């Protein structure tokens, strides 16, 4: 089997159908499979996933990294495409993924494929494009170089209130999404789990994912509340516990000014203003909650 699409879910009925529909051509006719690991959804997520041909596994929540690694462990394809439930494969990326799974047989095929992959790098050594071309030429065998290609970074178009946010650090937001099975692992973090390619080299694809992240302000405020609590735990773990004017007021203000003005967030209109304003509030919440946690610990220990 060529490809396994893996997704973790919890109450994603508003998103999962769109996501699965976008990858159907990649897995049709036995070319691949869809693995969904659900953590006890109470809506129609599981029903929708099964109706789209996904293999659904229901497991207790173990944390983002552990849950995603569990989904990867269930994959049987040579390649794994790891998606969030609110991500959609755009047509251009779909074409590129289809192309990448074709096996080159001649030098011309190899060169054509190379032109479809931009800024190939070693994740560890950041090897230059020129060096990689020399490697390809030295190896001679058209298949040998791409045998070492173990992962691809994919850009994400983050949507906020329906608008693609192109500035302020939100684009291109590249993530390692496609990798050979057995060559990547998610590393556990309280906030924003990270995936690491453990061997081989990685490239960047030209196509992108649509990330339907925050369709409403309520969604973003809920996200801010959850992630500021997790971020506060990280702050406490680092020992930055003091309630200070810098952390509660100046740091959020600097965050807003930097992202909105210096990183051109103002070019994203009203949506950009709201996003960066609320992101600054998130920073303030994070440090305020860290102070609250430290105060609670001091109360319990006294």
Spans of features found by a protein language model:
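Short aromatic/hydrophobic "clamp" motif used to bind/position activated sugar donors
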Residues: 80
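A conserved acidic beta->alpha catalytic loop
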Residues: 22, 34-47, 84
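Acidic donor-binding/catalytic loop of UDP-sugar-dependent glycosyltransferases
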Residues: 44, 65, 83-100
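Short, structured coil segments at secondary-structure junctions
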Residues: 30, 51-53, 76, 198
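Glycine-rich, basic loop-to-helix element that forms the pyrophosphate-binding segment
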Residues: 59-75
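Catalytic-site signature of metal-activated, phosphate-bearing donor transferases
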Residues: 72, 91-294
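Cell-envelope/extracellular polymer assembly enzymes that use nucleotide-activated donors
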Residues: 2-4, 33
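Short, well-formed alpha-helical segments that are part of the catalytic scaffolds
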Residues: 7, 12-26
């Amino acid at each position: 089997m060529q490809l396994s699409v893996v997704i973790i879910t919890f109450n994603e009925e508003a998103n999962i159908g769109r996501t699965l529909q976008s990858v159907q051509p990649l897995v049709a006719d036995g070319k691949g499979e869809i693995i969904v690991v659900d953590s006890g959804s109470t809506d129609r997520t599981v029903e929708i996933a099964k109706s789209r041909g996904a293999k659904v596994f229901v497991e207790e929540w173990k944390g983002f990294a552990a849950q995603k690694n569990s989904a990867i462990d269930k994959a049987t394809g040579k390649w794994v495409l790891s998606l969030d439930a609110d991500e959609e494969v755009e047509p251009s990326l779909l074409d590129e993924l289809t192309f990448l799974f074709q096996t080159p047989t001649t030098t011309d095929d190899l060169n054509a494929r190379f032109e479809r992959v931009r800024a190939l790098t070693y994740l560890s050594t950041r090897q230059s494009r020129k060096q990689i071309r020399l490697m390809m030429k030295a190896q001679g065998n058209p298949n040998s170089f791409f045998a070492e290609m173990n992962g691809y970074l994919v850009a994400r178009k983050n949507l906020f209130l329906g608008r693609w946010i192109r500035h302020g650090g939100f684009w291109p937001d590249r993530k390692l999404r496609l990798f050979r099975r057995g060559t990547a692992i998610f590393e556990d973090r309280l906030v924003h789990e990270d995936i690491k390619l453990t061997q081989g080299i990685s490239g960047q694809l030209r196509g992108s994912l649509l990330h339907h992240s925050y369709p409403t302000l309520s969604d973003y405020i809920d996200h801010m509340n959850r992630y500021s609590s997790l971020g506060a735990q990280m702050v406490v773990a680092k020992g930055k516990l003091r309630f200070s004017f810098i952390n509660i007021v100046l740091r959020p203000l600097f965050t807003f000014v930097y992202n909105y003005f210096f990183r051109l967030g103002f070019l994203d209109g009203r949506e950009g203003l709201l996003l960066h304003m609320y992101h600054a509030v998130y920073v303030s919440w994070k440090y305020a909650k860290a102070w609250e946690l430290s105060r609670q610990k001091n109360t319990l220990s006294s």
